[in-house]
Amino acid sequence: MSITAQSVYRDTGNFFRNQFMTILLVSLLCAFITVVIGHVFSPSEAQLASLDKVETLSDNAGLFEIVQNMSLEQKQVLVQASAASTFSGLIGNAILAGGMLLLIQLVSAGHRVSALRAIGASAPILPKLFILIFLTTLMVQIGIMFVVVPGILMAIVLALAPVMLVQDKMGVFASMRSSIRLTWANMRLIAPAVLSWLLAKTALLLLASRFAALTPEVGAILANTLSNLFSAVLLIYLFRLYMLIRQ
């Protein structure tokens, strides 16, 4: 059976429209969780204020020079802030992936599903999803840091790993290996979707300053919700495509 990207896009659009409110609530809940966890583990405002002083004194300096000129306490604040942002993002992404994939599974099986039920049903697989997303993010970031293209390629070839982990109950490394093989064989169907997702996330990042007009917490939740909606669309597409490839 020949699979066309157009037919999968159409199926994705239909599912997204039919389940929009549930998907929106899942995205909003995950954004709220991300922001709350980030706020809990982030340094206090007084500690963050010390970093503002460094920026003021070093407007013309490079990032490496700025970090070198920081005091030990300022470096600790920077590490804590970075760790809080990374950890909260990973938790939010794991819950989003688990909730969305379980939502798709249950709806496809004919069940009526709420956002809370979808997220709750994903609880048993969240530890494995967290590890998978951590490893995938690490590999993509390392690739982007060095030459960019390898990072983008890693994002593409590992795109099916969460779907395989949930749908076929694979282990973390088995799903990564299988995703690389299957994606490579279906690059024309997967690469455009992943690249579109990356472009959408990049555009949102560039527009992040627009959300500064709101309070920091509301702006962060709104930006994360939009980002989660982009990811939800990609997950729907990948799930539907994977089911067609397996037939």
Curated annotation (Swiss-Prot):
Primary location recorded for the protein, binned into one broad class: membrane
UniProt entry keywords in alphabetical sequence: Cell inner membrane, Cell membrane, Membrane, Transmembrane, Transmembrane helix
GO CC annotations on file: plasma membrane
Organism domain of life: Bacteria
Subcellular location: Cell inner membrane
Family of the protein in this entry: Belongs to the UPF0259 family.
Protein name: UPF0259 membrane protein YciC
Organism: Escherichia fergusonii (strain ATCC 35469 / DSM 13698 / CCUG 18766 / IAM 14443 / JCM 21226 / LMG 7866 / NBRC 102419 / NCTC 12128 / CDC 0568-73)
